[in-house]
């Protein structure tokens, strides 16, 4: 451990972030604005009527003051807490308080990010090991064909809210703020509309504050896991600390030393020695991939289980973390089915006297469109039935024909855009057929006409709208190379923005 003092040492100037007085200052919104904390500008707007969309930190201060008043917290005889303060506006107040807490608790971490970015901007520019979410798909294409084993892991979240507060305790050395946070979480959780005691992440309406709690937990977990991974790899990452701070994973904390208590750190490094271990995380899930034997993957699996269980008090069943061979397993990843296949390439070798054939087997990543899940999503969105037969979609009476057509065309283009990286795009023709015929049936239903009569009257205009694909756009931008480009994979940078919800792979596409 003596060779890593700088890694575990916590900056003493950051140990006493006293946030409690900031909660009651009405000028806090100006400080937040000056330091770039207004990513969601609606949080900081004042004097707005629609508080479901606009929040005021002045109102946050007043609500916290009322929450602390004794006559609003009544302790009943059986020990349960009743809070008539919330009343019929419990949803509204909890949302306002949640947004206010999110802005305040992000202040010290955002200041660290800005200072670290200014201090290490040159290192970030020179670092070859930084990765962002936009590089996930090219990473799969470049690296997965050279790997053998893969484990797809759902990152468990702390069941009890107290664990999330304890995670923040190592960052915020302010007992008053943590005490207020603990009270707020219990009040907010009681007013939350779900009966289950867990936090459902990555929903469209989820609060900024709960996402912040989740990110702090993931930062803590990855600080420990990736530190071990980097020290055990032959190709150690020299910029992991900068990488964490760049994406809101701010500092490594001294508490992770407890993981190695009573254990020789050099033994741990030799135990997990793996030159080709890759780690990818995306929206609550992670992928571990390796070129080594499945025995080493099993070691990493049980290390993760023990880390979650003993360090974060989160139970994770080892049997739910499967280790699969890439050649026999299809990875369901952000709306794609990906696997590694052997492709044979026959080369004829000619000499002066003989000729012979050489058969070369090469691994190649295949990404296919999940046609059945897509049809299921279309069925849930009322574009077709469960068997994939197009049906008319109910529309508003005041919708014009052009608005209806534009909506269907936009969905069709989003699908083509999102699956442009697929190696086999022919299955998308069926999806486009369903959308086109559903559009025609919707228009025919609106005009109280038959599909055949409406198509005859409309002519080829509708078909021209649906046939405009990436190939036509590329032909305008790259007239000489458009054919070669469109035949290959095209990974667009806004793919994660199109599919912003994991779990319903195509749900967000069909709602736009």
UniProtKB/Swiss-Prot annotation:
Q: What UniProt keywords apply to this chain's record, in alphabetical order?
A: Chloroplast, mRNA processing, Plastid, RNA-binding, tRNA processing
- Output one GO BP term: mRNA processing
Cellular compartment(s): Plastid, Chloroplast
Annotated signal sequence is none
One Gene Ontology term of the molecular function aspect:
RNA binding
Cellular component terms, GO, for this chain's entry?
Answer: chloroplast
Job description of the protein = Usually encoded in the trnK tRNA gene intron. Probably assists in splicing its own and other chloroplast group II introns.
In which family does this protein belong, per the annotation? Belongs to the intron maturase 2 family. MatK subfamily.
Which PANTHER family does this chain map to? MATURASE K
Q: Cite the HAMAP family for this sequence.
A: MatK (MF_01390)
Instruction: Write the protein's name.
Output: Maturase K
Gene this protein is translated from? matK
């Amino acid at each position: 451990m003596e060779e890593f003092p700088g890694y575990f040492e916590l900056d003493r100037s950051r140990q006493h972030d006293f946030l409690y007085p900031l909660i009651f200052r009405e000028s806090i919104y100006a400080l937040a604005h000056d330091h770039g904390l207004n990513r969601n500008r609606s949080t900081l707007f004042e004097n707005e009527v629609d508080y479901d969309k606009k929040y005021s930190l002045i109102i946050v201060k007043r609500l916290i003051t009322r929450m602390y008043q004794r006559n609003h917290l009544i302790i009943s005889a059986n020990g349960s807490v009743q809070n008539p303060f919330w009343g019929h506006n419990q949803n509204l107040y909890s949302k306002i308080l949640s947004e206010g807490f999110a802005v305040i608790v992000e202040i010290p971490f955002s200041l660290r990010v800005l200072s670290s970015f200014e201090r290490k901007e040159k290192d970030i520019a020179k670092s070859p090991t930084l990765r962002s979410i936009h590089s996930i798909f090219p990473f799969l294409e470049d690296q997965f064909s050279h790997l053998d084993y893969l484990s797809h892991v759902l990152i468990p979240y702390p069941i009890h809210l107290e664990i999330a507060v304890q995670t923040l305790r190592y960052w915020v050395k302010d007992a008053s703020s943590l005490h207020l946070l603990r009270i707020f979480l219990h009040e907010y959780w009681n007013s939350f509309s779900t009966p289950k005691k867990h936090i459902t992440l990555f929903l469209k309406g989820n609060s900024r504050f709960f996402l912040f709690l989740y990110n702090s937990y993931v930062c803590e977990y990855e600080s420990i896991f990736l530190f071990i991974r980097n020290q055990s790899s032959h190709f150690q990452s020299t910029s992991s600390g900068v990488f964490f701070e760049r994406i809101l994973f701010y500092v490594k904390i001294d508490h992770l030393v407890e993981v190695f208590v009573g254990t020789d750190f050099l033994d741990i490094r030799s135990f997990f020695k793996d030159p080709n271990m890759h780690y990818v995380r995306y929206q609550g899930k992670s992928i571990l991939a390796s070129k080594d034997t499945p025995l080493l993957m099993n070691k990493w699996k049980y290390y993760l289980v023990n880390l979650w269980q003993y360090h974060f008090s989160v139970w994770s069943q080892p049997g739910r973390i499967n280790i699969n061979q890439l050649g026999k397993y299809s990875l369901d990843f952000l709306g794609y089915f990906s696997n590694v296949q052997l492709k044979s390439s026959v080369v004829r070798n000619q000499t002066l006297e003989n000729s012979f054939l050489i058969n070369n087997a090469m691994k190649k990543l295949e990404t296919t469109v999940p046609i059945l899940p897509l049809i299921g999503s279309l069925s849930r969105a009322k574009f077709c039935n469960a068997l994939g037969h197009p049906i008319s979609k109910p529309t508003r009476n005041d919708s014009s024909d052009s608005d209806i057509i534009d909506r269907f065309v936009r969905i069709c283009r989003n699908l083509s855009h999102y699956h442009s990286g697929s190696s086999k795009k022919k299955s998308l023709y069926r999806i486009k057929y369903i959308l086109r015929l559903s559009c025609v049936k919707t228009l025919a239903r609106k005009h109280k006409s038959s599909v055949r009569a409406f198509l005859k009257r409309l002519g080829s205009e509708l078909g021209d709208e649906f046939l405009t694909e990436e190939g036509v756009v590329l032909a305008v931008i790259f007239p000489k190379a458009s054919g070669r480009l469109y035949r290959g994979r095209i990974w667009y940078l806004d793919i994660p923005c199109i599919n912003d919800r994991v779990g319903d792979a195509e749900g967000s596409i069909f709602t736009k």
